[in-house]
């Protein structure tokens, strides 16, 4: 068995993966604001404690870690969402954990999992997007990640969709993820509705479901869908995939957002090549995709 770990901008999830690629046990926690001030210590202490506990229950052969950001070998070169640079997480963990450790970009991990056992397993050419704190992605061709050489590539979240737009944490302006990440949608809803920052995603989802025709909610959701449509259409025009999968916390909102997205792309005629059917599907593995894919 293997241990898969998914590091997000606001959470850590650790799962034990069996030989069929499925999770048999999982532990997770949200990162508190005070923990984010010393993010490296918070990450390492939580991983070390739980890996040691799980090793007592299961025979573990290796560890895979899914991380948002640019990875080179076992080093996190830059993670905007975690706020770290040149962070050799694997090296630090090996001081306490005697197991092979590999680290990959989280969106690529999720894409691998969805293409092997999830929503994209029936397609040879697909694109996978993770919409959460930021936006990540990957291109899958014949069951394999698109080879981008020494650099990670597929940084879809930092595709510019608005000239001189909102400042991104990466330093550029107008990045896709500043407009179309789930964090952007939630923040805009809170601001428009005068809600506190502590208002959780589930509460916002309930508001959209119950009051979808409210003018403020309708406007915010409509603007969000339009920005998301532009980015997704750009990717379709470039790669012409058979299908697109969307994961991250978008999955929880898919019943109120997915059809709007597909209809908007078709109605606005953003696609260069017309399609009879636009296949955009929610991730079948949910937020577990990163955990599972990190071990593939």
Q: What positions do the PLM features span?
A:
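ATP-binding/phosphotransfer module of carbohydrate and carboxylate kinases, centering on a glycine-rich
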Residues: 1-62, 71-76, 91-101, 116-123, ...
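Active-site flanking residues adjacent to catalytic metal/cofactor-binding acidic residues
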Residues: 5, 105, 149
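Short clusters of small/polar residues that mark proteolytic maturation junctions
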Residues: 27-29, 81, 150
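A charged helix-plus-loop insertion that forms the helical arch/lid used to bind
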Residues: 76-86
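Short loop/edge segments at beta-strand edges and connector loops
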Residues: 103-107, 111
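Active-site glycine-centered loops adjacent to acidic/histidine catalytic or metal-binding residues
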Residues: 106, 132, 294
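Glycine-rich phosphate-binding loop of actin/hexokinase-like ATP-binding domains
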Residues: 121-179
